[in-house]
Structure formats: structure tokens, C-alpha cells
Regions:
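Beta-strand/loop substructures that line and gate deep hydrophobic ligand-binding cavities in soluble
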Residues: 81-135
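Short loop segments at secondary-structure junctions
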Residues: 16-18, 71-72, 96-98
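Generic structural detector for well-ordered beta-strands
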Residues: 11-15, 42, 66, 92, ...
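Short amphipathic alpha-helical segments
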Residues: 17-23, 129, 133, 137
Length: 148
């Protein structure tokens, strides 16, 4: 087992139409306004930006995100990630009943040296930290969608 490799999947059921959810998720520069753990987003060009995230644990991770796919018809937003974490992340936004199912998937390898050193003893804590970040993101997205 590679202790520095992670796969995450977070389904969010949201009581709003898919187009409204997609419109918010496709604007990562606004994430810091509604997702507390996304600390900053700095665009480098139309498809590439640098993000810094930090959840409950006392460390931040910075990575470059490069857009690989933006398909409103399919409800897919996908990025390649490099830096403190390397891999990919994808939102898939679909209709579900009278609302939306937004599924966040991520497969990454941790490259940040401190986290690599703590990979074995810290793995469960790192996964819990990710769950906290995703829970806060869902709450923030709901607030943002209600305000729009």
C-alpha cells in the first residue's frame, strides 16, 4: 500500500437545480468566499491557477490546478493538480429528483515532505481532516446557492 496515495469521493445532495450548482462550482476564484478551507486562488492564465487550502490541522497545502475538462452539458469539471498534492479532482453535477447530486472525486499523491513523513501514523487523521473540509464546503455551497 502506498500510504501517500489517497482516493476520495464525496456526494453532495443539494436542493437546487444542477445549472445553479455548476455555475458556482465552475468559478474557483470565488471558492474562498464560501468554502472556508480554500484560502486563496490565484489565476496564472485562463485554465491554470494556484490554490492554497487548509482544514482543521495546522498545515496548508498549495498546488497548481490546470483545467482538463469543463463540460456544462455533461456537468463535469476536472482539473490536474501538481505541487503539495499531485493527481486529479473532478466535480460531476447531475439532476437528482428535484435537486442536484454533485459528486467530488479526487485521486492524489501527497508530495508535501512533512505529510509524507507522517503518512503511516497520520493517515486516519488526514482522511478525517479531508472529511471536515468537504462537510464545510457543502455547508458553504448551500449558503452561497441560497444567496444567489
Amino acid at each position: 500500500m502506498d500510504w501517500n496515495h489517497y482516493r476520495f469521493r464525496s456526494p453532495w445532495h443539494l436542493p437546487v437545480p444542477p445549472a445553479a450548482v455548476f455555475a458556482v462550482l465552475e468559478r474557483p476564484e470565488d471558492y474562498p468566499h464560501w468554502w472556508p478551507q480554500v484560502r486563496s486562488v490565484t489565476w496564472l492564465d485562463d485554465a491554470t491557477g494556484i490554490l492554497t487550502i487548509r482544514s482543521a490541522l495546522p498545515y496548508a497545502m498549495t498546488f497548481t490546478a490546470h483545467e482538463r475538462r469543463r463540460d456544462p452539458a455533461a456537468g463535469i469539471l476536472e482539473i490536474a493538480m501538481s505541487g503539495d498534492i499531485e493527481g486529479w479532482a473532478r466535480w460531476t453535477v447531475t439532476a437528482a429528483g428535484s435537486g442536484t447530486l454533485a459528486v467530488y472525486e479526487q485521486e492524489v499523491d501527497v508530495r508535501k515532505p512533512l505529510l509524507r513523513r507522517l503518512a503511516v501514523p497520520g493517515r486516519a487523521v488526514f482522511r478525517a481532516n479531508h472529511r471536515l473540509m468537504m462537510r464545510a464546503g457543502r455547508r458553504g455551497l448551500l449558503r452561497r446557492l441560497r444567496a444567489v
